[in-house]
């Protein structure tokens, strides 16, 4: 029996996700607690005080002298809690040590809070272990274990009398337990410290009857309180009925050696429980109902009451361990679910185990429903009002984040009894395991594999084979596998480039003709196939590489685990949770009853062969909702073996869900020697313990449950009897089956969810099986969404609607045409053959129960996404080695590798996932806003352009929600150009601007960057769509060049400019000498002449003396002032020894510097702008007009150095002023550094962005006029565009004036003049926009006016104030 009880303690192993004790018999240190390395400590925790507890020799009185009014006096055979303890010195050592003694034990970091364990159970009465004197005769075993002792035995602490129903063991602090279903175990650190008020014992303390009010930071938000209240009301009547089961049901999941009269498992009355019909029970229920709203401050410390209500606290409708929804999301409360349903009914039990008192409980449910509605209407407003008044700060996002972090903290867990299926004897262990399977477990595995594991294969083998007819695509694939795809420009790596090769209709008909198909409207999965054809149409060469083919660089085969052990030393355990909980909380979760407790499915445990360190959270969009998949390192449940996990995985993922294309080994290792899957999964059926821990159901109990449930849905021999059942009895059975997954081995698909079960007999002469009704979803390829006619009509409808919205006058005929198209679309949607929702009716003959419900399948479909995410980030660590830089922000590296065509759908064959979700997932998932897919991704259309470009910049750096690498490519392009320009400028001091530009073009062109990307093997790490987008080599090389620029931008963004320079230099030159020359360039020639400073020359140079005035004006003192002089030297000036040349080379460098600084600013402060939008903003910021305006405001024209001897003021052209500013930027960078340039542009350039955005200066007049004209196009005709004609040319050749007119639809709408044709066209377009009433232009003005009314007022006031200042100055002078 002691061996059986060893499953209730966790042992720790260093460096792994499971605990494992080391050491010999006798006194050993306290069990080390586990804390994952990648979790931060939320609150400072004090280490627990180690103590040795010697239980008293005689049992103490469990009840106080004055019994509690809510309970009956204790019965003579009542089992006290805690059970009496024998003295440690009297009893012999147990035959099996508490933890197996392993050498070289290493202590691990503790949990944030060490778990509290009840005391050691007394030894079993057996011939070798006599009963303890003084113990009551009915005393049995208790399933808890105490941590091993660590010090010599001190005198036992005296037991202090308390006025409570039960006495707590010293291992528990006497505190009120939090609701275990929503909060992780988190004690106050002071609860583990010696109490100052307790002089009798230094190891425990007594708290006041009610705890002090919580701090504001620890209170729950009103939404969470409502969540608790609604959930508690909903399942209020379930906690009591679970105890009143028939005897055979209570004994069902238990080993025979534990079913004895003297064990702890006895009837309800033997436990001292109040009878169900006693009036004190009703009184206690009323008190609990009034008190439960304030249960954080008042909760009975009775442990028995906690056990009685633990199932209600956890919630029957919670089938997954979930975290709260993030800030900004509306949580889906159980109370809201109750209010929205027509008929309220509690969750039903599964597998046809019905309580004999269901009729009485139904009356109580109805009564509870009425009381709930009364309480809700009377007390909700007042209660929530008071809460919100007291705690307004709880609505802040940081509070929600704190609650989420607390929920994600690991909790201590334990396993249920091993029941002789596992042995934890250290002499039986193999390798680094802590548990090894016994012969009894081996027999269970053989039975499971025989009855369930091979059932599908046997059924398929019994059916006649079917060879589908070959199509043109099959023949083409066979030919392409023989002749490999060449890498020239015209070659293709996909056979889908020719549309005539593949006939979708023929492929769909072929799948419909399968003889084993279960129903015409149920779609099934075939390996490597989608619903409309093969998944991969790539050539044999292309299939050997790429993440899209599930080939992750750096992966190696894993040595197989030992099947009959838990391999605790080499596996890392993680608990998987999903947030928000929408669509993962079901009203009929999968529940397993064992040992008079109900274990609810909460998700999956994942066992990895390597620690998942430095891997970000997995985010995925499903049901139009952004989900986050968390994997939290936790203590490992010990009672499992790897073979049991694999048997369950094959049963669920292969036989039930039919995920044939989900490969956890990798295609490269399929033909290699046997290797282990990279992850093992274990379903978590848990019950919450009163002290914040969890009890996880052992794996063998799950397999036994599946074997028990494996029986016919409607047995043939009982069908006549079932048809004679009363209507109520049949409804009970049908309700139990609703949401259950049933399987018909050998069919396609094999498994389906039951939504209704009908027994109507249409032919009185023939008895037919009941009908299974399943509500499914037709694949998009076969519904109206995939119909070519519907798509064409939809496009024409949207186009016409847009034209009418922008038309100045809408004709009645156009309105009728739009209504006709809308009606035609509606008719197509309502066709039975085109509707997405279908109703499937199947005969229940041949269907078998599986024991699982849709919640298990719902969570199982998240696992392929998570495994793909983890494997991809593990292979990115291999990329870190290739580039020589380790990213701290792993999401940034993933973003750099993500092509715009990539979409993370399901982590595997998308049609397989959709089919399995439709067949076995929840019936009616709740969908979010469909805009979530393109909310931050859409960039087409004039309205989208105006909407995005009207957004002002963020004050603080904000992360972008655009999840591809185009923005990083925009930044990386500027970084590459800057690095190239700087190095060329310094390495070739005598080369003019034209030569420098030629060299730079050769380095930064895409063809060369693709070669550098090939050195890093970026094509093996890139994420892009598995389709024809990048099949051609030219397209792939272009994408690789963009990916390389994005990678450089990511290195610059996270690392520094120096890191980007080193990476670029390593890739440019393989030769170390050339690389050294490139990286260590010389100083500027003016700096080489005067290494320290040249300001001593100011005294003898009038030119330099004048430049000191400019230095004082801008507040920057140059170390080498001759650099500033060269920046202001125009190219008309000949060579001189002061400047050693003119400013044309500096202009080349300054342009690249300004591009980089402006690009970085826009990238950081405009997170919602795509690459094209950022380019428009940068063009409005870094252009000749803006640069000339800044140069003029700074007075640079006064300091320009020319060859004019008269020293008369000369009006410089716009281009010349812009060149002066760019040269000054280069001089500032050479003399100082890039930080000075950032500051200069922060002051002189970036504040102008607001004005540019409000005035829409980012859009030049010609582009704006063309956009307005295109909105007025007529359907079915070529769009009219504005035409420009030169009317007149006046003046000499060096000073001509051009007159240009613009025409639209044959009508002149504007005219303009300018010194060049381009400027004259701009003037004509501006004149047309002002005179012609374009609806689009009016819409843009109204949009900006409504959005920024206050900003526009302030801007106009500032402009008027600036215009009045010169006039006031002139008046003062007069």
From Swiss-Prot:
GO terms for biological process: defense response to Gram-negative bacterium; defense response to Gram-positive bacterium; miRNA metabolic process; positive regulation of gene expression; pre-miRNA processing; primary miRNA processing; regulation of inflammatory response; regulation of miRNA metabolic process. InterPro entries: dsRBD_dom (IPR014720), RNase_III (IPR011907), RNase_III_dom (IPR000999), RNAse_III_DSRM__animal (IPR044442), RNase_III_sf (IPR036389). Residues 475-491 have a biased composition (Acidic residues). Residues 216-289, 298-313, 364-399 have a biased composition (Basic and acidic residues). Zn(2+) 1 binds at residues 536, 538, 549, 1026. Residues 1260-1334 form the DRBM domain. Gene3D superfamilies: 3.30.160.20, Ribonuclease III domain (1.10.1520.10). Residues 182-202 have a biased composition (Low complexity). Ubiquitous. Changing residue 923 to A: Abolishes RNase activity. CDD domains: DSRM_RNAse_III_meta_like (cd19877), RIBOc (cd00593). Residues 390-1365 are annotated as: Necessary for interaction with DGCR8 and pri-miRNA processing activity. Residues 70-95, 145-160 have a biased composition (Pro residues). Changing residue 914 to M: Impairs RNase activity. Keywords: Cytoplasm, Endonuclease, Hydrolase, Magnesium, Manganese, Metal-binding, Nuclease, Nucleus, Phosphoprotein, Repeat, Ribosome biogenesis, RNA-binding, RNA-mediated gene silencing. Its EC number is 3.1.26.3. Zn(2+) 2 binds at residues 561, 609, 676, 680. Its cofactor is Mg(2+); Mn(2+). Residues 1-95, 130-406, 452-497 are annotated as: Disordered. It is found in: Nucleus; Nucleus, Nucleolus; Cytoplasm. Ribonuclease III double-stranded (ds) RNA-specific endoribonuclease that is involved in the initial step of microRNA (miRNA) biogenesis. Component of the microprocessor complex that is required to process primary miRNA transcripts (pri-miRNAs) to release precursor miRNA (pre-miRNA) in the nucleus. Within the microprocessor complex, DROSHA cleaves the 3' and 5' strands of a stem-loop in pri-miRNAs (processing center 11 bp from the dsRNA-ssRNA junction) to release hairpin-shaped pre-miRNAs that are subsequently cut by the cytoplasmic DICER to generate mature miRNAs. Belongs to the ribonuclease III family. Component of the microprocessor complex, or pri-miRNA processing protein complex, which is composed of DROSHA and DGCR8. The microprocessor complex is a heterotrimer; each of the two DROSHA RNase III domains binds one DGCR8 (via C-terminal region). Interacts with SP1 and SNIP1. Interacts with SRRT/ARS2. Interacts with CPSF3 and ISY1; this interaction is in an RNA dependent manner. Interacts with PUS10; interaction promotes pri-miRNAs processing. This is Ribonuclease 3. The gene is DROSHA.
């Amino acid at each position: 029996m002691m061996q059986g009880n060893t499953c209730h303690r966790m042992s720790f192993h260093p460096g792994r996700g499971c605990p494992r004790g080391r050491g010999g018999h006798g006194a050993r240190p306290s069990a080390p607690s586990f804390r994952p390395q990648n979790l931060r400590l939320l609150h400072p925790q004090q280490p627990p005080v180690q103590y040795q507890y010697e239980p008293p020799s005689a049992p103490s009185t469990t009840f106080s002298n004055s019994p509690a009014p809510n309970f009956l006096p204790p019965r003579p055979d009542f089992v006290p809690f805690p059970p009496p303890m024998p003295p440690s010195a009297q009893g012999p050592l147990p035959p099996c040590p508490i933890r197996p003694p392993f050498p070289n034990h290493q202590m691990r970091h503790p949990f944030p809070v060490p778990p509290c364990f009840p005391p050691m159970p007394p030894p079993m009465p057996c011939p070798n272990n006599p009963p303890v004197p003084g113990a009551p005769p009915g005393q049995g075993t208790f399933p808890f274990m105490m941590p091993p002792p660590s010090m010599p035995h001190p005198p036992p602490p005296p037991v202090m009398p308390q006025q409570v129903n039960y006495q707590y063991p010293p291992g528990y602090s006497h505190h009120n337990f939090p609701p275990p279903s929503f909060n992780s175990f988190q004690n106050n650190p002071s609860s583990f410290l010696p109490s100052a008020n307790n002089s009798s014992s230094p190891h425990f303390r007594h708290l006041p009857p009610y705890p002090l009010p919580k701090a504001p930071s620890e209170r729950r938000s009103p939404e969470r309180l409502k969540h608790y209240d609604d959930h508690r009301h909903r399942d209020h009547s379930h906690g009591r009925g679970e105890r009143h089961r028939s005897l055979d049901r209570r004994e069902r999941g238990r080993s025979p050696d534990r079913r004895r009269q003297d064990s702890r498992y006895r009837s309800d009355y033997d436990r001292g429980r109040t009878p169900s019909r006693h009036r004190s029970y009703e009184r206690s229920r009323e008190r609990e109902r009034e008190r439960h709203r304030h249960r954080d401050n008042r909760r009975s410390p009775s442990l028995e009451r906690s056990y009685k209500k633990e199932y209600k606290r956890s919630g029957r409708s919670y089938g997954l361990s979930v975290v709260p929804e993030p800030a900004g999301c509306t949580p889906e409360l159980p109370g809201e679910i109750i209010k929205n349903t027509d008929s309220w009914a509690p969750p039903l039990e599964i597998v046809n185990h019905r309580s004999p008192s269901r009729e009485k409980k139904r009356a109580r449910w109805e009564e509870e429903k009425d009381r709930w509605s009364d309480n809700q209407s009377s007390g909700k407003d007042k209660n929530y009002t008071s809460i919100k008044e007291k705690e307004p700060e709880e609505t802040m996002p940081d509070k929600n984040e704190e609650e989420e972090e607390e929920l994600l903290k690991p909790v201590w867990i334990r396993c249920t009894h091993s029941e002789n299926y596992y042995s934890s004897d250290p002499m039986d262990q193999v390798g680094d395991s802590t548990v090894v399977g016994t012969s009894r477990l081996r027999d269970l595995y053989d039975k499971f594999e025989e009855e369930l594991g091979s059932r599908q294969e046997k059924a398929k083998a019994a059916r006649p084979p079917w060879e589908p007819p070959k199509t043109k695509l099959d023949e083409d694939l066979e030919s392409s596998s023989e002749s490999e795809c060449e890498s020239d420009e015209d070659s293709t790596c996909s056979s889908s480039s020719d549309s005539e090769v593949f006939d979708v209709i023929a492929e769909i008909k072929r799948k419909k003709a399968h003889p084993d198909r279960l129903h015409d409207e149920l779609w099934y999965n075939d390996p490597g196939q989608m619903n409309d054809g093969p998944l991969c149409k790539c050539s044999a060469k292309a299939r050997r590489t790429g993440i899209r083919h599930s080939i992750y660089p750096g992966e190696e085969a894993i040595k197989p685990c030992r099947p009959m052990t838990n391999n605790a030393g080499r596996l890392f355990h993680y608990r998987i949770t999903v947030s928000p909980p929408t669509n993962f909380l079901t009203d009929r979760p999968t529940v397993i009853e064992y040992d008079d407790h109900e274990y609810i499915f909460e998700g999956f445990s994942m066992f990895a062969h390597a620690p998942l360190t430095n891997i970000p959270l997995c985010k995925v969009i499903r049901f139009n909702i952004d989900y986050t998949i968390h994997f939290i390192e936790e203590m490992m449940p010990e009672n499992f073996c790897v073979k049991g996990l694999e048997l369950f995985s094959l049963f669920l993922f292969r036989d039930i869900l039919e995920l044939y294309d989900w490969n956890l080994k990798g295609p490269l290792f399929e033909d290699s020697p046997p290797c282990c899957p990279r992850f093992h999964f274990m379903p978590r059926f848990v019950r919450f313990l009163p002290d914040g821990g969890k009890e996880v159901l052992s794996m063998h109990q799950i397999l036994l449950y599946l074997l028990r449930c494996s029986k016919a849905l409607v047995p043939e021999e009982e069908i006549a009897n079932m048809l004679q059942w009363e209507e109520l009895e049949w409804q009970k059975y049908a309700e139990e089956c609703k949401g259950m997954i049933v399987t018909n081995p050998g069919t396609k698909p094999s498994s389906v969810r039951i939504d209704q079960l009908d027994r109507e007999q249409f032919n009185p002469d023939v008895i037919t099986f009941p009908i299974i009704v399943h509500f499914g979803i037709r694949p998009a390829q076969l519904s109206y969404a995939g119909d070519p006619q519907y798509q064409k009509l939809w496009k024409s409808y949207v186009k016409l609607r847009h034209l009418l919205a922008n038309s100045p006058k809408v004709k009645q005929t156009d309105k009728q045409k739009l209504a006709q198209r809308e009606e035609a679309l509606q008719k197509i949607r309502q066709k039975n053959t085109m509707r997405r929702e279908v109703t499937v009716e199947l005969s229940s003959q041949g269907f078998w129960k599986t024991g699982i419900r849709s919640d298990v399948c719902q969570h199982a479909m998240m696992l392929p996404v998570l495994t793909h995410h983890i494997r991809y980030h593990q292979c990115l660590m291999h990329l870190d080695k290739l580039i020589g830089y380790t990213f701290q922000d792993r999401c940034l590296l993933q973003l750099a590798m993500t092509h715009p065509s990539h979409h993370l759908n399901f982590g595997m064959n998308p049609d397989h996932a959709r089919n399995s979700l439709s067949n076995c997932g929840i019936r009616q998932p709740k969908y979010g806003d469909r805009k979530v897919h393109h909310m931050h991704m859409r960039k087409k259309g004039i309205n989208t352009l105006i909407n995005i470009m009207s957004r002002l910049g963020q004050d603080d750096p904000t992360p972008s929600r655009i999840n591809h690498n185009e923005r990083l490519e925009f930044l990386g392009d500027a970084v590459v150009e800057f690095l190239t320009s700087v190095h060329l400028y310094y390495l070739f001091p005598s080369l003019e601007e034209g030569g420098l530009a030629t060299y730079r073009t050769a380095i930064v062109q895409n063809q060369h960057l693709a070669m550098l990307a090939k050195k890093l093997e970026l094509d093996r790490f890139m994420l892009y769509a598995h389709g024809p987008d990048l099949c051609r080599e030219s397209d792939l090389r272009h994408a690789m060049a963009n990916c390389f620029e994005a990678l450089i931008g990511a290195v610059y963004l996270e690392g520094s400019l120096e890191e980007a320079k080193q990476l670029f230099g390593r890739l440019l030159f393989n030769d170390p000498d050339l690389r050294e020359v490139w990286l260590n360039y010389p100083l500027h020639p003016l700096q080489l002449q005067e290494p320290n400073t040249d300001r001593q020359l100011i005294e003898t140079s009038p030119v330099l003396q004048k430049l000191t005035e400019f230095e004082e004006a801008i507040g920057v003192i140059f170390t080498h002032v001759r650099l500033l002089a060269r920046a202001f030297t125009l190219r008309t000036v000949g060579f001189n020894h002061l400047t050693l040349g003119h400013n044309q080379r500096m202009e080349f460098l300054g342009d690249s510097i300004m591009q980089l600084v402006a690009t970085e600013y826009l990238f950081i402060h405009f997170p919602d702008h795509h690459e094209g939008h950022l380019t428009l903003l940068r063009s409005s910021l870094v252009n000749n007009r803006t640069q000339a305006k800044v140069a003029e405001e700074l007075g640079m024209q006064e300091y320009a150095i020319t060859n004019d001897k008269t020293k008369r003021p000369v009006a410089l052209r716009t281009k010349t002023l812009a060149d002066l500013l760019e040269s000054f930027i280069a001089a500032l960078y050479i003399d100082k550094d890039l930080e000075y340039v950032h500051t200069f542009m922060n002051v002189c350039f970036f504040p102008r962005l607001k004005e540019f955005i409000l005035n829409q200066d980012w859009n030049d007049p010609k582009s704006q006029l063309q956009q307005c004209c295109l909105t007025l196009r007529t359907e079915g005709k070529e769009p009219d565009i504005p035409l420009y004609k030169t009317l007149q040319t006046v003046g000499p050749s060096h000073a001509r004036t051009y007159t240009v007119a613009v025409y639209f639809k044959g009508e002149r709408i504007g005219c303009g003049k300018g010194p060049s044709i381009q400027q004259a066209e701009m003037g004509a377009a501006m004149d047309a926009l002002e005179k012609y009433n374009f609806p689009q232009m009016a819409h843009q003005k109204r949009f900006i006016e409504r959005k920024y009314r206050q900003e526009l007022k302030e801007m106009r006031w500032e402009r008027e104030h600036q215009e009045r200042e010169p006039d006031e100055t002139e008046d003062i002078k007069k």
